[in-house]
């Protein structure tokens, strides 16, 4: 039986724009074989939507709690959604 897939929306706030955060997300998501996207939000946060197995998404979440060297993560929220299957790769959206 195949492992169940999930969709998660992760919102990270703090000093997370202009510090390479989206590229950090991209690199880690690809390493974890996740699909979805990450993008800057107008309020200064970074939104990530990821699909994959739960342990993969949780591993990404744990990496995003720390972030890249010049980031200052103040808060991170995760919201679990139903798997959509709409993504075939992981990308940075503008």
Segments predicted by a language model, with ranges:
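Intrinsically disordered, low-complexity, mixed-charge
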Residues: 1-94
């Amino acid at each position: 039986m195949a492992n169940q897939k999930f969709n998660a929306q992760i919102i990270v706030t703090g000093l997370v724009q202009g510090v390479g955060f989206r590229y950090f997300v991209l690199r880690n998501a690809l390493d974890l074989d996740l699909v979805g996207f990450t993008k800057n939000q107008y309020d200064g946060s970074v939104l990530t939507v990821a699909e994959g197995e739960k342990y993969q998404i949780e591993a990404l979440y744990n990496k995003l709690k720390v972030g890249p060297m010049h980031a200052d993560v103040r808060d991170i929220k995760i919201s679990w959604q139903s798997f959509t299957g709409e993504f075939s790769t992981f990308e940075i959206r503008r």
